[in-house]
């Protein structure tokens, strides 16, 4: 997919992710990446999908994300650590989004687990597909693009003809926020409750100036 020049960079990222979701022919969640665009094959984990999209839509921004020396790409907790480290007047192309209500299409949301164990997920990283909405209890629901081991709410993944039980897809994740509106916990799937973990949000933008709205 070629860049759509009239769109902002976050919107271009989201368009790339949506293209993958809409055109995949095979997908499963796995740590060993196997992606073949021509065949529509996207077998990867969450950071594999994010890396694949960013390398194509925003390679200079992707290069800013730190990775471990023994890993081919940044894992989920590295996105969390990087976004958390950003200051309000950052001019390095990435901007931290503090409030859930300020999330926009193309933003990247990441969280990390307390313990980083060899051979296990370190957290999760995903693209926001659209602006969050709130429910009567004040929780936020965000449609996302990601690669996941199980479907989220109202998800393109699942059981049934033409669906895949894991891998790349789009669905809704719910978030709780604190009194200031910062995300504090997430509900990943209908079978799970809210899980409190450190959450951080990043947005690509110019390499100087402020974040794009």
Q: Which residues does each predicted region cover?
A:
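Low-complexity, compositionally biased segments
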Residues: 21, 25-26, 39, 48-50, ...
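...with weaker cross-activation on analogous glycine-rich loops/strands in unrelated enzymes
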Residues: 68-153
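Alpha-helical structural elements
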Residues: 24, 72-78, 88-89, 106, ...
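N-terminal capping segments
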Residues: 1-74, 195-213
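Low-complexity, Gly/Ser/Thr/Pro-rich intrinsically disordered linker/tail segments
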Residues: 141, 147-213
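Low-complexity, polar-biased intrinsically disordered regions enriched in Pro/Ser/Thr/Gly
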Residues: 33-37, 118, 136, 186
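Context-gated lysine
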Residues: 64-67, 78, 96, 159, ...
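Arginine residue identity/basic-tract feature
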Residues: 28, 56, 73-75, 104-105, ...
């Amino acid at each position: 997919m070629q860049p759509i020049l009239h769109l902002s960079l976050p919107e271009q990222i989201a368009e790339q992710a949506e293209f993958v979701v809409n055109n995949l022919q095979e997908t499963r969640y796995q740590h060993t990446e196997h992606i073949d665009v021509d065949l529509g094959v996207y077998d990867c984990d969450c950071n594999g999908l994010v890396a694949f999209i960013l390398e194509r839509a925003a390679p200079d921004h992707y290069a800013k994300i730190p990775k471990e020396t023994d890993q081919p790409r940044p894992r989920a907790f590295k996105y969390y650590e990087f976004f958390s480290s950003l200051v309000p007047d950052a001019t390095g192309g990435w901007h931290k989004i503090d409030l859930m209500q300020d999330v926009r299409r193309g933003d990247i949301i990441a969280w990390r687990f307390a313990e980083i164990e060899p051979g296990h997920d370190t957290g999760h990283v995903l693209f926001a597909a659209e602006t969050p909405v709130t429910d009567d209890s004040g929780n936020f629901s965000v449609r996302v693009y990601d690669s996941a081991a199980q479907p989220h709410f109202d998800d393109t993944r699942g059981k049934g003809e033409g669906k895949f039980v894991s891998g790349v897809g789009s669905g809704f994740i719910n978030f709780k926020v604190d009194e200031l509106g910062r995300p504090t916990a997430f509900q990943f799937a209908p079978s799970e409750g809210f899980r409190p973990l450190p959450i951080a949000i990043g947005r690509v933008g110019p390499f100087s100036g402020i974040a794009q709205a």
